[in-house]
């Protein structure tokens, strides 16, 4: 079985730094490395049949293989892409970027051959002693078996490997500002215990300069997000370094960075997946890199919109969604500094059919164009729990419209094929009427009852196409205060004046207001609902002032208005909430909006519903 492995591969990697080979190795042991709040990293002891080496480390995109136990002790895998990092003491670490599990641990079962540890200090591999020549069969090498390839072949998290990562980045040399040469190391290998290092990274985000005052005077900072093939890191420059580097560094350009200070990252303020962050100091060097094609752009770790409800308040997430609709930008005044800032809500939907409200601020809000319903990828949006789950796009967040990544193409294909016909179910505050009027959470009246809507601590909102089957016209109108902002019932003083207790004023006139109880029904269920002024007028087709006059002067005509409203169908937007009165709990349903039925749109939605049901 030794012949299945790439004998001598470990020596070739450790002596020559050869990253062009794709060796077949066996995993002997895996152990996790503590990484704080970041995704775990794993160190692997691997064998090529002749030697073993414990200097293998997996990149975080391989974590699912370990967690699903596809990559485990005794399995055989092909290393398709890796990086060799040389530490300052001369030792080498191999970072595994892509691999494919060829044979599972269950199939192999045991360690292959009798490999001995590779002694890096000797510069030569230690060769296992030859096995006794017991029989010709024992020394013959079996051919590799044609087993099915395991599910361990990986694709980079956010970008296709061929398009984004290109060639593997092995160790290389760069000139720093002091004229000396230092090895370029991967971001993933940086720790506070290293003094001399250089990374080659792409700038994926650059903040504006922030200023503040304290006892030391005026201070300022700006921050960057940097990415290479192995990972990402946040860098911050203060004061003199702001003046020095801010004009020189551009987003999406690649630079050599060296001699920064590394410290434990504050995860409260960044979505960057790294335990450490970099601070520029007086010795920091930043130099442009012309050969930038092999480096990725922004790295995303997407959270599905339906999973946002499981995220804690104020956590930072990466999200991708179609801009289903958006609002106009408005101006608000920030209380803390009394500055006016632009604000715009956009509504994002993904393949789960869930919709989340995301708020853009400042320049992002002013310049946003959602007219073509773009795919938006947002890195580092903050989760809010106000009225559900919503997102705030921070100044440190990165927004990319129609990114060139597989998730975006998949989402666009789904939306064009079927998603655009869906209204979506909002996980954000629905009191405003949903997604720009479009997110209506369609339910049948039976579903409303069977799903116990309105039974929770907060009200639920839904929309339904239903028919009016009965209107309770008794006591449906009352005389109200004539002032514009008051709808309080007035008291007839029997002297030609009407008193409003709320306004503490007597008026010579009043206005009619309506509270109409209506029984609506669809093909499965019926429901009593309460309609206030605008909703009642929409159902009856007449305004309250005319109906009040009709009630006083022509009772028969008044009756006919109600008769004509029977068996008319509408789209009802309803709020449901359980209420307790005299120790008795019941669901109160209040109509928030009434619209005529668009039967073309209604028919299309029914067809899509039938198609979805057929796939279940």
From Swiss-Prot:
Cross-link (Glycyl lysine isopeptide (Lys-Gly) (interchain with G-Cter in SUMO)): 449, 577
InterPro entries associated with the record: Euk_RPA1_DBD_C, NA-bd_OB-fold, NA-bd_OB_tRNA, Rep_factor-A_C, Rep_factor-A_N, REPA_OB_2, Rfa1
Crosslink feature (Glycyl lysine isopeptide (Lys-Gly) (interchain with G-Cter in ubiquitin)) location: 22, 88, 163, 167, 183, 220, 244, 259, 267, 331, 410, 431, 458, 553
Region (Disordered) residue spans: 121-155
Phosphothreonine modification, residue list: 180, 191
Residue stretches in coiled coil: none
Keyword list, A-Z: Acetylation, ADP-ribosylation, DNA damage, DNA recombination, DNA repair, DNA replication, DNA-binding, Isopeptide bond, Metal-binding, Nucleus, Phosphoprotein, Ubl conjugation, Zinc, Zinc-finger
Feature: DNA-binding region: 197-281
GO terms (BP aspect): base-excision repair; DNA damage response; DNA replication; double-strand break repair via homologous recombination; mismatch repair; nucleotide-excision repair; protein localization to chromosome
Post-translational modification, as annotated: DNA damage-induced 'Lys-63'-linked polyubiquitination by PRPF19 mediates ATRIP recruitment to the RPA complex at sites of DNA damage and activation of ATR. Ubiquitinated by RFWD3 at stalled replication forks in response to DNA damage: ubiquitination by RFWD3 does not lead to degradation by the proteasome and promotes removal of the RPA complex from stalled replication forks, promoting homologous recombination.
Listed Low complexity bias regions: 134-145
Zn-finger region bounds: C4-type: 481-503
Residue positions, PTM N6-acetyllysine: 163, 167, 259
Keyword DNA damage on entry: yes
Gene Ontology cellular component terms for the protein in this record: DNA replication factor A complex; nucleus; PML body; site of DNA damage
Sequence positions bearing Phosphoserine: 384
Modification sites for N-acetylmethionine: 1
Segments of skewed composition (Polar residues): 146-155
Subcellular location(s) of the protein: Nucleus; Nucleus, PML body
Presence of keyword Zinc: yes
MF term (GO), any: zinc ion binding
Record note on quaternary structure: Component of the canonical replication protein A complex (RPA), a heterotrimer composed of RPA1, RPA2 and RPA3. The DNA-binding activity may reside exclusively on the RPA1 subunit. Interacts with PRPF19; the PRP19-CDC5L complex is recruited to the sites of DNA repair where it ubiquitinates the replication protein A complex (RPA). Interacts with RIPK1. Interacts with the polymerase alpha subunit POLA1/p180; this interaction stabilizes the replicative complex and reduces the misincorporation rate of DNA polymerase alpha by acting as a fidelity clamp.
Family: Belongs to the replication factor A protein 1 family.
Annotated function: As part of the heterotrimeric replication protein A complex (RPA/RP-A), binds and stabilizes single-stranded DNA intermediates, that form during DNA replication or upon DNA stress. It prevents their reannealing and in parallel, recruits and activates different proteins and complexes involved in DNA metabolism. Thereby, it plays an essential role both in DNA replication and the cellular response to DNA damage. In the cellular response to DNA damage, the RPA complex controls DNA repair and DNA damage checkpoint activation.
The protein's name in its UniProt record: Replication protein A 70 kDa DNA-binding subunit
Organism expressing this protein natively: Pongo abelii
Lineage: Eukaryota, Metazoa, Chordata, Craniata, Vertebrata
Name of the gene this protein is made from: RPA1
């Amino acid at each position: 079985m030794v012949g299945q492995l790439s004998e001598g591969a470990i020596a070739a990697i450790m002596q020559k730094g050869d990253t062009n080979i794709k060796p077949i190795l066996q995993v002997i042991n895996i152990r996790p490395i503590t990484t704080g709040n970041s995704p775990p990293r794993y160190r692997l002891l691997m064998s090529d049949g002749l030697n073993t080496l414990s200097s293998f480390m997996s990149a975080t995109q391989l974590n699912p293989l370990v967690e699903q136990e596809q990559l485990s002790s005794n399995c055989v895998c092909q290393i398709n892409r890796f990086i060799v990092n040389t530490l300052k003491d001369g030792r080498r670490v191999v970072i595994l970027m892509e691999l494919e599990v060829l044979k599972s641990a269950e199939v192999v079962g045991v360690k292959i051959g009798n490999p001995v540890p590779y002694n890096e200090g000797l510069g030569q591999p230690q060769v296992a002693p030859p096995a006794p020549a017991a029989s010709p069969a024992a020394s013959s090498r079996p051919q590799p078996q044609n087993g099915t390839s395991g599910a361990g072949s990986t694709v980079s998290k956010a970008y296709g490997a061929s398009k984004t990562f290109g060639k593997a980045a092995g160790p290389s040399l760069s000139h720093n500002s002091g004229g000396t040469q230092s090895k370029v190391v991967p971001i993933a290998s940086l720790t506070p215990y290293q003094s001399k290092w250089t990374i080659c990274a792409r700038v994926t985000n650059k903040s504006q300069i922030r200023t503040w005052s304290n006892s030391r005077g005026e201070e300022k900072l700006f921050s960057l997000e940097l990415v290479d093939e192995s990972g990402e890191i946040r860098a911050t420059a203060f004061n003199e370094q702001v003046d020095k580097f801010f004009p020189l560094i551009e987003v999406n350009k690649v630079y050599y960075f060296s001699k920064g200070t590394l410290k434990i990252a504050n995860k409260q303020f960044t979505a960057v997946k790294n335990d450490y962050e970099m601070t520029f100091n007086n010795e920091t060097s930043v130099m442009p890199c012309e050969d930038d094609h092999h480096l990725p752009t922004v790295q995303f770790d997407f959270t599905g919109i339906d999973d946002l409800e499981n995220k804690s308040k104020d956590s930072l997430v990466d999200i991708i969604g179609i801009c289903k609709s958006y609002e106009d930008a408005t101006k608000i005044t920030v209380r803390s500094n009394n500055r006016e800032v632009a604000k715009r809500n956009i509504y994002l939907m993904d393949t789960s059919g869930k919709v989340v409200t995301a708020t853009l601020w400042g320049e992002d809000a002013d310049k946003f164009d959602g007219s073509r319903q773009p795919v938006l990828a947002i890195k580092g949006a903050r989760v809010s729990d106000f009225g559900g789950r919503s997102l705030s796009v921070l100044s440190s967040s990165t927004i990319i419209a129609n990114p060139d990544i597989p998730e975006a193409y998949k989402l666009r294909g789904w939306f064009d094929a079927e998603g655009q016909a869906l209204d979506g179910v909002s996980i954000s505050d629905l009191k405003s009427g949903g997604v720009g009027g479009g997110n209506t959470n369609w339910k049948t009246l039976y579903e409303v009852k069977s799903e116990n809507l309105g039974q929770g601590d907060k009200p639920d909102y839904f929309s339904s196409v239903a028919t009016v089957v009965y209107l309770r016209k008794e006591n449906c109108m009352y005389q109200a205060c004539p002032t514009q902002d008051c709808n309080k019932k007035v008291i007839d003083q029997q002297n030609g004046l009407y008193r409003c207790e709320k306004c503490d004023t007597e008026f010579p006139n009043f206005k009619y207001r309506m509270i109409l109880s209506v029984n609506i029904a669809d093909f499965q269920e019926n429901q009593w609902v309460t309609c206030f002024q605008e909703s009642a007028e929409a159902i009856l087709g007449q305004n309250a002032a005319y109906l009040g006059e009709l009630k006083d002067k022509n009772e028969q005509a008044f009756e006919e208005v109600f008769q004509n409203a029977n068996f008319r169908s509408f789209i009802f937007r309803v709020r449901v909430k359980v209420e307790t009165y005299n120790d008795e709990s019941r669901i109160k349903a209040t109509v928030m909006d009434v619209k005529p039925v668009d039967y073309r749109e209604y028919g299309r939605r029914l067809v899509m519903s039938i198609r979805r049901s057929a796939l279940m």
